Amino acid sequence: MFRATCNTRDFKKVINATSNLVDEICFEVDENGIKASAMDPSHVALVSMEMPKEVFEEYEGDIHDIGIDLEALKKIIARGKGDEKLILDLDVEKNKLNVTFKSNVTRKFSIALYDVSSSNLKVPDIEYPNNVSIKAGAFVEALKDAELVNDHITLKVDEDKFIIYSKGDLNQSETVFDNGIEDDDATLAEFNMGEASRSTFNLAYLKDLTKSTAAEDLLKIYLGSDMPVKIEYEVSGSKLVFLLAPRIES
């Protein structure tokens, strides 16, 4: 069986963040919580989410692989209100996931499931020379600046600085976060540099994977030269991890 009760607002944020990159996913359910990983259709980005049982108000789960249409689930979850309880209930016989919103009124939806098994995708264990922790709001603003210039951006770590750089045929954009300057707002919360590095990425993907963040969310970004960028952040105890392949420059 599988049945879980949680806060609608937090679950909505996790689903929105995941569905920005993939259309369908397999929830791996067991007694410890929910896990899922999937590649985007172009195999450029990987998304992984983990919701331990502790983030739920009530949780009962046996081992199940639940293949779900994320776009359908996202539309249903969007109908939920922040003060409503969200109840997820697996109907094995009918092969459906029941989604119930409960307050003084009870609303129930059912989603047909895909007959799929877990892809066993895992986030690869890569050793990165550099990592930074930065407020999502500041990172997103730098992406907006870069978008004015090009559809690709370069993430650089050099001389105690984290740099977001974009160059077009005529124009360029650069945002520099200097670890050596005192920052009362702590925009750059952590900076660990092992070596200078630079990698270039598709801007649209970076926008998608940060679209559901709040300004004060802390992004942990792992970087190395011509390596995939790994971005992690948490939503009320749930963990989201994104891996994006670099654009290899000739």
Curated annotation (Swiss-Prot):
One GO term of the biological process aspect: leading strand elongation
Keywords of this entry: DNA replication, DNA-binding
Gene3D superfamilies named among the record's database cross-references: 3.70.10.10
Pfam families: PCNA_C, PCNA_N
Keyword Lyase in annotation: no
Keyword DNA-binding: yes
Disulfide bonds: none
GO molecular function: DNA binding; DNA polymerase processivity factor activity
Matches recorded under SUPFAM superfamilies: DNA clamp
Family affiliation: Belongs to the PCNA family.
Quaternary data: Homotrimer. The subunits circularize to form a toroid; DNA passes through its center. Replication factor C (RFC) is required to load the toroid on the DNA.
Job of this protein: Sliding clamp subunit that acts as a moving platform for DNA processing. Responsible for tethering the catalytic subunit of DNA polymerase and other proteins to DNA during high-speed replication.
The protein's name: DNA polymerase sliding clamp
Source organism: Methanococcus maripaludis (strain C6 / ATCC BAA-1332)
